[in-house]
């Protein structure tokens, strides 16, 4: 199973086109948040319409897709305090067996087999949410999603990946950046122990001093491709899954290519 991983696209037309053209060469495309750009001169409503069309084009190529929300993906008029957990625009089209949207745990079917995917929404509220009409806390919602992801992994015998925009704090994936959300990410990944977790948010992590694109946190392999400057091809990771504890990950960005392999143990 070949999975293309990235994040922080910020409605960069060049990056979107590159991924659209590359997606058919892979079994699935996963994006860990920040599809929109709140600093762009293009209105956010127009941005989200373009992103949804782009996603549909990827799906029409016959490949699978999943995304989670990032801090750029919420805006007034689409989301209000104490409302749904995820940006409404990201859920305008229902999920299917080949598409997992924000705030879900589902079995994602690909041409080469299944993949358990959990997509954690950005904690825009930092407190209570309304999920399916019921008030709950963000922590309880996340625990519910992770429990469901673990169940899919165990029952289906498939690898499990968690998408969460914020990288785990105190790891090279966040470089020197630290926020309370980063500590929260580290704690939930430590507790859930998925096979992989995909993050973003810190664009420069793979190329800055003390930063890197891959880190093992307990049994979980955490990934952050980082992101390039506007107009450049996107930083990305190609994950080729061959079986439990047998996979290859290749990071490409900033004119460099780095490789990590697991044949029982991780080698970078």
Residue ranges and their predicted role:
Residues 6, 11-110:
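Core catalytic region of metal-dependent phosphoesterases/phosphodiesterases
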Residues 3, 27-28, 97, 159-161, ...:
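Short, Asp-centered acidic motifs that coordinate Mg2+ and/or phosphate
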Residues 10-17, 36-40, 67-81, 105-107, ...:
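Active-site environment of divalent metal-dependent phosphoester hydrolases
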Residues 28, 185, 189-199:
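Proline-aspartate-enriched helix->loop->beta-strand connector
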Residues 2-10, 113-126, 161-165, 220-227, ...:
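Active-site-proximal beta-strand elements of phosphoester/diester hydrolases
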Residues 37, 73-184:
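Conserved catalytic scaffold of divalent metal-dependent phosphoesterases
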Residues 60-65, 193-195, 217-220:
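A short helix->loop->beta-strand "cap" motif at the edges of active sites that frequently abuts
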């Amino acid at each position: 199973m070949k999975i293309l991983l990235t994040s922080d696209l910020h409605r960069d037309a060049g990056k979107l086109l590159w991924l659209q053209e590359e997606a058919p060469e892979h079994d699935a495309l996963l994006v860990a948040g920040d599809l929109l750009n709140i600093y762009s001169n293009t209105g956010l409503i127009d941005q989200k319409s373009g992103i949804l069309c782009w996603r549909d084009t990827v799906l029409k190529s016959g490949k699978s897709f999943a995304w989670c929300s990032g801090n750029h993906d919420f805006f007034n008029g689409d989301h209000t305090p104490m409302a749904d957990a995820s940006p409404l625009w990201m859920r305008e089209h229902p999920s299917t067996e080949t598409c997992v949207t924000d705030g879900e745990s589902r079995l994602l079917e690909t041409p080469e087999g299944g993949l358990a995917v959990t997509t954690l929404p950005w904690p825009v509220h930092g407190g209570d949410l309304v999920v399916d009409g019921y008030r709950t806390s963000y922590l309880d919602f996340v625990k519910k999603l992770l429990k469901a992801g673990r169940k899919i992994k165990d029952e289906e015998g498939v690898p499990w990946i968690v998408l969460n925009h914020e990288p785990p704090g105190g790891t090279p994936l966040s470089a020197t950046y630290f926020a309370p959300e980063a500590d929260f990410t580290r704690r939930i990944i430590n507790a859930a122990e998925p096979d992989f977790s995909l993050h973003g948010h810190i664009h420069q992590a793979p190329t800055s001093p003390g930063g890197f694109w891959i880190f093992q946190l307990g049994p979980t392999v955490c990934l952050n491709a980082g992101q390039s400057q506007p107009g450049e091809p996107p930083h990305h990771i190609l994950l080729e899954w061959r079986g439990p504890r047998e996979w290859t990950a290749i990071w490409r960005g900033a004119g460099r290519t780095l490789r990590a392999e697991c044949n029982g143990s991780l080698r970078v």
